[in-house]
Every structure is written in C-alpha cells, then in structure tokens.
C-alpha cells in the first residue's frame, strides 16, 4: 500500500496534550493530583511495611492486601509523574518507546488490580462460607500460585496490545489528547485499519466484566451464608469483615464504569470530562485503598498505631538522654 511522504511507520515521539479545554487550569489541577499521589505512596508503603514487620498479619487476606498495595503503587507511578510534568512544566513530549512502556504498565497494573480484587473476593468467600477449612484451602502455596496467576494473566492480555500498536503505521498527526498513553488513544492516530485493535479493546473490557461477575457471584454466596447465621452479632461481624473489600471494589470499578459509559454513549459530553474520568479511574483507587483498609481493618489500624507509638517512645527516650547529659 502506498503511503504519503510525511508518513512515519514508527514516529520518534508523541505529544500529550493533558486535558484539552482546561489548559489554563493545568497548573492548579496538578496540585490535587500531586496530593493524591503522595497519599497513595505513603499509604500503600505503610501497609506493605506493616504487613512485612508484623508476623500476625502473615495471613492470606493480608498477602492479597500487599498485592493490592503493590499494584496501586505501580498504577499511580505509571501515570501521575508524567501527568504532573505536563501540568506544571509543559513536558508534553514523550518518545515512542516510552509511550509504549507507559501503556504497557498502565494496562498491566489495571488488569492485575482487577484480578487481585477477584482473589480477595475468593478469600472472603472461603472465610465466610467455609471458615473451618479456610487454612486448609488457602495455604501459602495456593496464595503464591494465585499471585503468579495474577501476574501471568495480565501479561498474556497486555503483550498483544503492544504488538498490535507496533504493527500500525502512524501518519502526520502525533498528538494524543490525553494525559497518558493508552491503547485506543494510540490506535486512533494510525492511518491503517484498527479493526483488530477495537476487537482487542472489547475483549479487554469483557475480561473486566468477567471479573466483576465473579466478584458479584462470590458476594451473593457470601450474603446468603451471612443471613443464615443464627445471631445478629455474628451477621454484623461477618458483614464488617467484607466491608473494606466492598468499598475497594466500588472505588476501582465505579470510575471505570462511568469512564466507559461516557466514552461509548456520551457523544455530547465534553472531551475534558472523558479525560478527567479516565484519570479518576487510574489515580483514585491507589489513594483510597490504603485509607479504607487503614480505617476499617482493625489489625492494620492497631499495627500502625503500635509503630507510631514505638517511634514516639524512642524519640522521647532520646530527648530525655540528651537533656540529662
């Protein structure tokens, strides 16, 4: 097929516009995104530190929570630093290889997070529906296999997206009206047919819908088991056990659902609304997850409080030693 002279099969770089229509507000929009990133990093690293240092938390539930915290750090780090570069210092250019790398990590961590939420739903299901067999079913080996499966599944689904982009020729327009590189945003810049890319995108959406369906079915069984419990206190305790996970599920899938609905059916919705929803989908869950678990999970809350009190006690001892001598 003949291509025009200005065609580059693989361009040297792309230009990320940020949030089209809100360019004058970029510098101010950057501050809440920076705050979100700081909270996400501090919160998730705190959870990882607490789980690592406290042996009482070496249980399947907290191993899955550690996986969630790791994917949250990866997802926020893959998106927000570049976003802040666009907002604050007009660093809009991104080389082709870096764009593909960012796309890979964003989609990879998104699929990993969805899979971890499925694993956590299974953990809750076993804990509520088969409590006596919990330790026999969810052994350390099983948790390790699930963790490996989360990683491998994401790779299997994401690697084709890179190959599908590499096969496309890119014509004159190298401007991406977004804050980060993502599969369909890049595909739409191509001058070739992107039918296969669209089919791949629909398969990826079906993958997330499958995860949501599995989680929903798990909680249907959980609720049935909970309402069969003999006492009101037992029912409340069981529901509280699942409360944190439900909040995390809503924090992850709700922005994603709104983003998908406006992208597919909101043709009259301004572009900046699409971009803001897409950003919420990848930056809000990493911030909310550690806050939700820190507040709602007693073991995490107690361990963080214990560490803080120990540090305060050490500082007080050092102060007394210095004042005495």
Curated annotation (Swiss-Prot):
Pfam families: 7tm_4. It is found in: Cell membrane. Glycans are attached at residue 5. It comes from the Eukaryota. SUPFAM superfamilies: Family A G protein-coupled receptor-like. Disulfide bonds join 99-191. The chain crosses the membrane at residues 28-48, 57-77, 102-122, 142-162, 199-218, 239-259, 275-295. Keywords: Cell membrane, Disulfide bond, G-protein coupled receptor, Glycoprotein, Membrane, Olfaction, Receptor, Sensory transduction, Transducer, Transmembrane, Transmembrane helix. GO terms for cellular component: plasma membrane. The keyword Glycoprotein applies. The keyword rRNA processing does not apply. GO terms for molecular function: G protein-coupled receptor activity; olfactory receptor activity. It is a multi-pass membrane protein. Residues 49-56, 123-141, 219-238, 296-325 are cytoplasmic. Residues 1-27, 78-101, 163-198, 260-274 are extracellular. Belongs to the G-protein coupled receptor 1 family. Odorant receptor. This is Olfactory receptor 52E2. The gene is OR52E2.
């Amino acid at each position: 097929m003949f291509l025009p002279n200005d065609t580059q099969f693989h361009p040297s770089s792309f230009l990320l516009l940020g949030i089209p229509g809100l360019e004058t507000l970029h510098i101010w929009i950057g501050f809440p995104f920076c705050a979100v990133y700081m909270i996400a990093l501090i919160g998730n690293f705190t959870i990882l530190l607490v789980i690592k240092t406290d042996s009482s938390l070496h249980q399947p539930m907290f191993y899955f929570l550690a996986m969630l915290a790791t994917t949250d750090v990866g997802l926020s780090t893959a998106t927000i630093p570049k976003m802040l570069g666009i907002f604050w210092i007009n660093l809009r250019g991104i080389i082709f290889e870096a764009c593909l790398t960012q796309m890979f990590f964003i989609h990879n961590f998104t699929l990993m997070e969805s899979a971890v939420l499925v694993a956590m739903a299974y953990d809750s299901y076993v804990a509520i529906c088969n409590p006596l067999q919990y330790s026999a079913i969810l052994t350390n080996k099983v948790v390790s296999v699930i963790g490996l499966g989360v990683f491998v599944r994401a790779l299997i689904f994401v690697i084709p997206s890179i190959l599908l982009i590499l096969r496309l020729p890119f014509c004159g327009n190298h401007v991406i009206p977004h804050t980060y590189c993502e599969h369909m945003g890049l595909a739409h810049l191509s001058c070739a047919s992107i039918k296969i890319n669209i089919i791949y995108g629909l398969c990826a959406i079906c993958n997330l819908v499958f995860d949501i369906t599995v989680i929903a079915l798990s909680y249907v069984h959980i609720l049935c088991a909970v309402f069969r419990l003999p006492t009101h206190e037992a029912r409340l305790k069981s529901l509280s056990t699942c409360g944190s996970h439900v909040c995390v599920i809503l924090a992850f899938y709700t922005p994603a659902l709104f983003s998908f609905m406006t992208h597919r059916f909101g043709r009259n919705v301004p572009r900046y609304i699409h971009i803001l929803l897409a950003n919420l989908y990848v930056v809000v869950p990493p911030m909310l997850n550690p806050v939700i678990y820190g507040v709602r999970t007693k073991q995490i809350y107690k361990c963080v409080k214990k560490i803080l009190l120990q540090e305060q006690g050490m500082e007080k001892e050092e102060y007394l030693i210095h004042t005495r001598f």
